[in-house]
Amino acid sequence: VSEISPSRLPSGRHNLPREFVVTSQRDRLLDSMAQACAEKRYAEVSVADIVSRARVSRSTFYEIFPDKEACFLAAYDAILGRFVTDLIKACDDPDLTWPEMIERGIEACLRFLAAEPAFARMCIVDMFSAGPAALERYLSAVRMIAAFVDGGRTMMPERDVVPESIAGMVIGGAAVVIRAEIVDERTEMLPEVGPDLLYAILVPYMDKEEALERSERYAERLGLVTSS
């Protein structure tokens, strides 16, 4: 079953609107790009790989995308849109404290990636070999999340105690951990690193005992440890 469930057209002649046909073909190409990258490195994926999986012609591919990179970027943009929607939904509660929002955000992020292993690999591993435009999209997403984490400085009695740059460093480190799990083919187990990531993100902004306590409660909720 396709991870993004691209619509399939009926075989043979049909009277479907042209817009519907193009949308279906485009969705299938995006899914095929992700699936191909899951099996090969981006540099090794060819247009032939993509169209054969999508069951569309090479000419159809070039009617929709000018090249392989454009298809890759479109797939990334599509999955990032869904990721951001899930993240916003998870944190959209005015009663949540900042640490609670961070925990909700981490859990939503890791569950999303675990459920979309092909796209997780494409967006977090293959971005680095897909050219400057792809890398800029990746860095933009990291900066977006870092800006959210930087809200923790408002919790500090003196905001200048924690430099603004810390958020970017923490999120960059978290991304390395996530990338390593994906490369080691542990994508479906990503939620298990959530408690450790929570501690790493919270500890620059609060007492380390409180950060550890929140991390341990998170682990208990996931069933990773049992309460004494």
Residue ranges, per PLM feature:
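Helix-turn-helix
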Residues: 36-70
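Alpha-helical DNA-contacting segments of helix-turn-helix folds
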Residues: 21-24, 28, 36-37, 65, ...
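Short, structured motif recognition centered on aromatic/hydrophobic residues
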Residues: 42, 83, 99, 121-123, ...
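Amphipathic alpha-helical packing segments from all-alpha helical-bundle domains
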Residues: 132-155, 164-176, 191-199
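Hydrophobic alpha-helical connector segments
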Residues: 88-118
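Short, amphipathic alpha-helix enriched in basic
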Residues: 20-49, 228
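C-terminal peripheral helix-coil segments that are non-catalytic and often amphipathic
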Residues: 1-13, 111, 115, 147, ...
